[in-house]
Amino acid sequence: MEEIIINGKCLYSSKGAAREYGPVGCNFYRGCPFQCTYCYNRRGLTAPVLGVDHAVLEDCFTKEKNRPKKYRDISAETYAMIVFKRELERHLDYCRQTGIFFSFSTDPMLDETHPLTWRAVNYAVQKQVPVTVLTKCAFTFELHNDWFGKNLDYHQGLQKYVSFGFTLTGRDDLEEGAARHFSANSDRIKAMSQLKELGYNVWASIEPVIDLDSSFEMIRESLPYCDHYKIGLQSGVAKGYYGSLSKLTRFILHVRKAIAEYPDVTVYWKESVRKELAGTHVDEHLKHPQFIGGGFEWVKKKEGI
């Protein structure tokens, strides 16, 4: 597949660590009420813009001066959807191969963000474009649109193309920035089990690994309901943060042993892990039939897309 660089208002080509989640992302909003202490959006030069404590629809949609005159009398959300449709049509064949990731700059299932997210997801599915949603909001599925109460026909129309991911750190104490949005890690695993029962592809982002024991416990508890894991280390920490190389080795071997009981489960070890192990004997442990590439490869393999 020839790479296409997308630089739209909604869709864009991801870079660096973000690309390991998917080559194409969609960001309607920036900011997040969780204010997790480890969030990469809260660090660096872009923190005042991306790290705000509430979700904000991007200026390119909200400010009239940024819109063509014929679109200035409609809502910002409606205009955002028009732009999304136009950009997706322009890159349709490519996005059918890469899928679309929601979202790198906010949680797409917040009260404020999920209505527009779902308009976009449903449109993408109509166009046979796979999408994946990464969230910490387990309760959104129950509170909005009676998600688990919908008839099976509704879910069958989405199952092949929509995958749900949940961030699992095992450290609720670092994620309680906004009580009205907060879902404990245990609540997220419960939502994973319900979505799995409905036939969806379900995955977990074990990133960042804040401490090895907590992360492994999240993997162990979620394994019956999870199709895929993406595991990455915490950025910006001091060398030796995870202790000796032998501790990281044991973590990898424990993961290998745990997933062996679930042969259809796959794992992607992010570059942060592979870089930590480069040049050591331990990187041999990352060679395993259930350890695969990043992006949407696990969904495409599973669904035959």
Positions of predicted regions on the chain:
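Feature targets compositionally biased, intrinsically disordered low-complexity regions
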Residues: 7, 15, 98, 156, ...
